[in-house]
Amino acid sequence: MLPLAIPPNNIVRAMSSPNATGPLMRTSKAIITSNYTLLTDKTPYLLPVCFNESCRAEQVRMLYRRFFRLRPLVAQRAMIKESYTNYIRVKFSEDYALKRRQALPQNTCPVLDAIEAGRRSLTFILKAVSEIEDADSNPELAYDNYICRKILKNVLTLEYQRERLEFKNPKRKQILRQNYEYLDAKYHDPKYTSLRNADVSIIHFNETLGTRL
C-alpha cells in the first residue's frame, strides 16, 4: 500500500459542478471539464532530473516551489487553500527532530534526511491530487491515491485546528509550533488531547513511509 513512486497518471483538480459532462475548455496545458482540470504538462509539479546534483539550498527551494504550485490542486475552497499554505510554511521552518522527540521519546532511530523526506512528502501530495485515467485497469494505484487524499484532508483539518487554537490565544503558538509541549503524554490539557493523538499518529505514519507530513 502507498508506494511512494511518482504517479504516472494525470494530475487533476476537482471542479464544482459534478453533474455536467464534456470538455468545457482545452488549452496547451490542460483540459478543463465540469468535474476536473486535467493537466497535460506535469513538469512544473515534478522535481527536475538535476535535483540530485543541485546544492542543498537549491533542493530546498525546488521542493518549496513545487509544494506551493500544488495549492490550486489541493482544494477549491479558500479556507482549505489557506490552511495548506500555512501548513507548507510551517513544515519548512519547524524543528521536526524536536517534534518527533516529544511525540516518540522512546524512538532512538535517526531522523530521515530532510531533503529525502521532503521528496517523499511531495510525491505523497502529488498522489493525493491525482486521478487514474482508467481506474479499473489499476485499482491498487487508484486506491492508494484515494487513501493519500483522505490522509491529506485529515492533515489539513489538524492544521486548521491549530490555527483556531492560536487565533483564540496567540500564546499557544509556543506550545503548538515551538516546543511541541502538547505532544508530551504527560501534558494534561483536554484542549490538546485529540490534536495530540492525531499528530502522534501522523508522526508514526511518517516513520513508516519516510515522509514529513
From Swiss-Prot:
Q: An example of a Gene Ontology BP annotation on this entry?
A: mitotic recombination
Which of UniProt's keywords are assigned here?
Sporulation
Tell me where on the tree of life, at the top rank, the source sits: Eukaryota
Relate the protein's function as given in its record. Answer: Involved in sporulation and maintenance of the mitochondrial DNA. Is probably involved in a pathway contributing to genomic integrity.
Membership in a protein family: Belongs to the IRC19 family.
Q: What name appears for this protein in its UniProt entry?
A: Increased recombination centers protein 19
Gene that encodes the chain: IRC19
